Regions:
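Structured beta-strand-rich core segments of catalytic domains in phosphoester-bond hydrolases
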Residues: 1-58, 163-167
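Residues that flank catalytic or metal-binding motifs in active/ligand-binding sites
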Residues: 2-5, 42-46, 57, 62, ...
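A short secondary-structure junction signal
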Residues: 20, 62, 72-74
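Hydrophobic/aromatic residues located in beta-strands of well-ordered beta-sheets
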Residues: 61, 94-96
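A short, histidine- and acid-enriched strand-loop-helix "catalytic/donor-clamping" loop
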Residues: 69
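Metal-dependent phosphoester-hydrolase catalytic domains
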Residues: 14, 72, 76, 83-94, ...
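Active-site metal-binding loops of divalent metal-dependent hydrolases
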Residues: 64-66, 99-100
Length: 175
């Protein structure tokens, strides 16, 4: 494929895909390549509706990449993702991951965690953390002590988080 994408990796032995798709973070989410609000470029969210093969429980996973410029685009993207979760799985558990291009002080972050549809920051509700406290490496231009967390995992209340790990640069073998 060409252009923006946000893939979801999963273990086929553990999960069955019941449905899947993507939507564009825009006023016209079903129009491929549509750019929304004040976004600099087209952005997307990919989703999957899964069944856990052991327990039979159904849940939704969403992976996304928010715009790096548009303030309104990020806030509206958060609302759109929440609406899509409600539409696709209702009150069933959901996990939202991605590069949100925001910190936890940003309005879009607050929209994710304070909306009537409750999402929680997995890092903040986890009793244990591993790795580093940032997720943006600064592309070699930012000292380690000034790097920020811009990638998040949000979960619905029915999901228990026991530990979060943000791997240090190059430690992708943790997952």
């Amino acid at each position: 494929t060409e252009g923006e994408y946000a893939c979801i990796f999963y273990k086929k032995g553990n999960y069955e895909v019941l449905d899947q798709g993507n939507f564009w973070l825009s006023e016209t989410p079903d129009v491929p390549g549509s750019k929304g609000w004040d976004a600099a470029i087209e952005r997307i969210a990919t989703w999957g509706k899964f069944r856990d093969k052991k327990t039979g429980k159904i849940f939704m996973a969403v992976n996304t990449h928010f715009d790096h410029v548009g303030i309104e685009a990020r806030k509206q993207s958060a609302l759109l993702i929440i609406d899509k979760i409600k539409e696709i799985v209702g009150k069933r558990p959901a996990v939202v991951t991605g590069d949100f291009n925001i910190t936890d002080k940003n309005e879009a972050y607050k929209t994710m965690v304070t909306n009537k549809f409750v999402l929680k920051d997995a890092y903040k509700i986890s009793p244990s953390h591993g790795g580093v406290a940032y997720s943006c490496n600064g592309f070699g231009k930012t000292s380690q002590n000034k790097r920020q967390k811009i990638d998040f995992i949000f979960v619905t209340p029915k999901i228990e988080v026991n530990r979060t790990v943000t791997p240090m640069d190059g430690e992708s073998h943790i997952i």
